[in-house]
Amino acid sequence: MSEHSLLGAGLGAIIGAILALTGAGGGILAVPLLVFGLGLSMVEAAPIGLLAVGLAASVGAVLGLRQGIVRYRAAGFVAGIGILMAPLGLWLAHRLPNLPLALLFSLVLLYACGRILRKARLELKQGQPAPRPAFMPCVLNPAQGRLRWTLPCARALTFTGMLSGLLSGLLGVGGGFVIIPALSRYTNLDSKSIVATSLAVIALVSLGSVVTASLSGIMHWAVGAPFALGAVLGLVLGRQVASHLAGPRLQQLFAITGILAALLLAGGALGLIAP
């Protein structure tokens, strides 16, 4: 294995470990790592990041399915919408210069990390997770243990799928920072089920986007394969220590790291920071 491939595998392992420790939203750092670590452009990094995040999320989703905590109908619905929207994001990405893509990614990363930071701060202050909305359009039927499918529920999940799919194709993000808050806001699922269902959506949408990128001839497998394998290995190893390290303090550290990465990415794109 070449030095470049080893570096890619090492960076992938970092992403896998972050996913294991911080949850489904941790994969958003994959693209900045590829840009900084391997010198790729945004368009080159996006499908590689999705490949790694998709495979790592697949591992988590399979484990969730075995535990019976994945709402597979909701996951399939959201993912189906996302897969349909991802090619539009990919089409837009290839028609935008690197600068606006990098700046847009930086803004999305700042937004996502800002939400994580706020949530962690509230949890530390209150000693428990922040309260959820009183009205939720998607609620479990206690008799069947399944979500009640109503028009408001379908509308909320459709919007979630559209946004996550568009961002997946456009920026190469799995969409956990969209899906997890949406499921927390619109459903009364418990946190474990929300994360597991989100991982299933991320896996399906990400891998669907990777297939689209491969068919378009823009997937660099020589870089993507070691990076993805490293991510899966990092996820498996990270899960061994996740229960001992995970918590609001770790979420704060992740959010601050993400904010710094966003600022560095924007600064590099604007020429304010030397490559």
Regions inferred by a protein language model and the residue ranges of each:
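Juxtamembrane transmembrane-helix boundary motif
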Residues: 1-17, 36, 42, 63-165, ...
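N-terminal transmembrane alpha-helices
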Residues: 12-24, 50-53, 57, 79-82
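Short helix-coil transition sites and intra-membrane helix breaks within transmembrane domains
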Residues: 18-27, 168-175
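Interfacial segments of multi-pass membrane proteins
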Residues: 30-44, 168-169, 178-193
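Generic transmembrane alpha-helix signature in multi-pass membrane proteins
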Residues: 30-31, 58-69, 167-168, 179-184, ...
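Conserved glycine-rich helix-kink/hinge and helix-boundary motifs of the Major Facilitator Superfamily
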Residues: 47, 195-196, 255
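Short hydrophobic/aromatic, small-residue-rich stretches within specific transmembrane helices
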Residues: 49-53, 198-202, 223-228
